[in-house]
């Protein structure tokens, strides 16, 4: 009986050690991958489209949350400290307002343009116009697909610099991704060119569509200018309603990452319906419409053009 028990125990230990070794091997293989951190779901999705499974990727701001103001979790601090490369938007997004990202990388002892990089580098910046934010950069450059292409090229450039052994994969994926975005951009311009000029007005909660407006020739109006200021005050709401009495657009839109109630008040008091939810600061959860940068931009372009054409 003792001998049999020894054999069973020996077999068990052999299996245990085999599993443990296998597990350790997997862990080591994973740790060999480039450790990449992106500040939000949009940048993370672009990075994933270019890098695929060649990297370990962590996105800081959860899907559906506001990247302007965020309190990093312990996991975010750990991942940032251990990252080989960090991608952030810049131009007054994560480094505006309470500057949560600036504090995060400082505490992690990371260096700009060595460890962390602004993916917006090289875009033509548009500036805010409101009294409290006048002269500050408008961060929402990705809402112009041409800027999304610049973001993607900046991401690929740093991935290649940090991980040259996978250069061929990054270049191949970038080429396919850029072609896809260029095709969508061309289709969007045709759609908006076909809409009558007197119907062209995007009305949103946050004034985040300036880059979109410039790219596709559609002016914008909003309740508040940027999410770092007061949002949906009575004065902001009444000011927009007065404008809408003159302009009379056919539809309103509300962003997925903001409180719907201010726009619902505008809709009720103006008699103008909310046509659709749209995406600005975040992609959608996996499996939902808008669950990638490409998908969210296609959704926005389709819904806005449909709403304005009514």
Swiss-Prot record:
Primary residence: membrane
Binding residue positions for Fe(2+): 68, 140, 206, 281
UniProt-listed GO biological process terms: cell adhesion; iron ion transport
InterPro entries according to UniProt: AdhesinB, Bact_metal-bind_prot9, Lipoprotein_PsaA-like, ZnuA-like
GO CC annotation: plasma membrane
Function: Part of the ATP-binding cassette (ABC) transport system MtsABC involved in iron import. Binds iron with high affinity and specificity and delivers it to the membrane permease for translocation into the cytoplasm. Has low affinity for Zn(2+) and Cu(2+).
Keywords attached to this entry: Cell membrane, Ion transport, Iron, Iron transport, Lipoprotein, Membrane, Metal-binding, Palmitate, Signal, Transport
Lipidation (N-palmitoyl cysteine): 21
Upper classification of the organism: Bacteria, Bacillati, Bacillota, Bacilli, Lactobacillales
Signal sequence coordinates: 1-20
Lipidation residue positions, type S-diacylglycerol cysteine: 21
Family statement drawn from the similarity comment of this UniProt entry: Belongs to the bacterial solute-binding protein 9 family. Lipoprotein receptor antigen (Lrai) subfamily.
Organism encoding this protein: Streptococcus pyogenes serotype M1
This protein's name: Iron ABC transporter substrate-binding lipoprotein MtsA
Consequence of changing residue 281 to A: 18-fold decrease in affinity for Fe(2+). 100-fold decrease in affinity for Fe(2+)
Protein location: Cell membrane
Gene Ontology molecular function: metal ion binding
Entries under PANTHER family matching the protein: HIGH-AFFINITY ZINC UPTAKE SYSTEM PROTEIN ZNUA-RELATED, METAL-BINDING PROTEIN HI_0362-RELATED
Membrane topology: Lipid-anchor
Statement: the UniProt record of this protein carries the keyword Lipid metabolism: no
């Amino acid at each position: 009986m003792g001998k049999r028990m020894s054999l069973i125990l020996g077999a068990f230990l052999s299996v245990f050690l085999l599993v443990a070794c296998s597990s350790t091997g997997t862990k080591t293989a994973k740790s060999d991958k480039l450790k990449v951190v992106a500040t939000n779901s949009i940048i993370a999705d672009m990075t994933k489209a270019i890098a695929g499974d060649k990297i370990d990727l962590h996105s800081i701001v959860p899907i559906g949350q506001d990247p302007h103001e965020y309190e990093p979790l312990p996991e975010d601090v750990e991942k940032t400290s251990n990252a080989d490369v960090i991608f952030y938007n810049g131009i007054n997004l994560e480094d505006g307002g309470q500057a949560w990202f600036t504090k995060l990388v400082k505490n992690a002892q990371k260096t700009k343009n060595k460890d962390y990089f602004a993916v917006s580098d090289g875009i033509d910046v548009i500036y805010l116009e409101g009294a409290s934010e006048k002269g500050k950069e408008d961060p929402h450059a990705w809402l112009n697909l041409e800027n999304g292409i610049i973001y993607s090229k900046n991401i690929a450039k740093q991935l290649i610099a940090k991980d040259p052994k996978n250069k061929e994969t990054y270049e191949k994926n970038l080429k396919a991704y850029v072609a896809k975005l260029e095709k969508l951009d061309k289709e969007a311009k045709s759609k908006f060119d076909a809409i009558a000029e007197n119907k062209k007005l995007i009305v949103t909660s946050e004034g985040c569509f300036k880059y979109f407006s410039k790219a596709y020739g559609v002016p914008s109006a909003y309740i508040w200018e940027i999410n770092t200021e007061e949002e949906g005050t009575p004065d902001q709401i009444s000011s927009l309603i007065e404008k809408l009495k003159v302009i009379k657009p056919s539809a309103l839109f509300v962003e997925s990452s903001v409180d719907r109630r201010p726009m619902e008040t505008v809709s009720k008091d103006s008699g103008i319906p909310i046509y659709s939810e749209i995406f600005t600061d975040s992609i959608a959860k996996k499996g939902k419409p808008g669950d990638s940068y490409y998908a969210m931009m296609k959704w926005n372009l389709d819904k806005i053009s449909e709403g304005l054409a009514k």
